[in-house]
Amino acid sequence: MQIFVKTLTGKTITLEVEPSDTIENVKAKIQDKEGIPPDQQRLIFAGKQLEDGRTLSDYNIQKESTLHLVLRLRGGAKKRKKKNYSTPKKIKHKKKKVKLAVLRFYKVDENGKIHRLRRECTGEQCGAGVFMAVMEDRHYCGKCHSTMVFKDDDRP
């Protein structure tokens, strides 16, 4: 029976084969016609690569079927050189977790009454949780830049 082999260049080769011929035999016939070594050939039929040990009938290749010939690629990507660093890697900063850190903002007197050591900002954009810095004669918010001046009886 006659089959066709289409190469990458678009050239079509006709081969006389039998259904019992192996893929190796077909590759040998292609080598005779084109001069391409069988170890570099890959034959594809119906989207599947044909394995050397099997026959044409295993793949249901009938008369006037077309096989596609592609060449096997050797090797892989270009190897990259490993970078050599002259200085050791920087150690990342680890944040230290302080247990009960919120206690810095409050003081408990001998009667058990809780006093806030810092004042929360009353600005519109700050809200609860933003504390003001204690200066000598005032409280100052670093976020919204508002300032509250102490009265004589209001000093901490």
Curated annotation (Swiss-Prot):
Keywords: Cytoplasm, Isopeptide bond, Metal-binding, Nucleus, Ribonucleoprotein, Ribosomal protein, Ubl conjugation, Zinc, Zinc-finger. InterPro entries: Ribosomal_eS31, Ribosomal_eS31_euk-type_sf, Ribosomal_zn-bd, Ubiquitin-like_dom, Ubiquitin-like_domsf, Ubiquitin_CS, Ubiquitin_dom, Ubiquitin_ubiquitin-like. There is a cross-link at residue 76 (Glycyl lysine isopeptide (Gly-Lys) (interchain with K-? in acceptor proteins)). The record marks 68 as: Essential for function. GO terms for biological process: translation. GO terms for molecular function: structural constituent of ribosome; zinc ion binding. A zinc finger (C4-type) spans 121-144. Gene3D superfamilies: 6.20.50.150, Phosphatidylinositol 3-kinase Catalytic Subunit, Chain A, domain 1. This is Ubiquitin-ribosomal protein eS31 fusion protein.
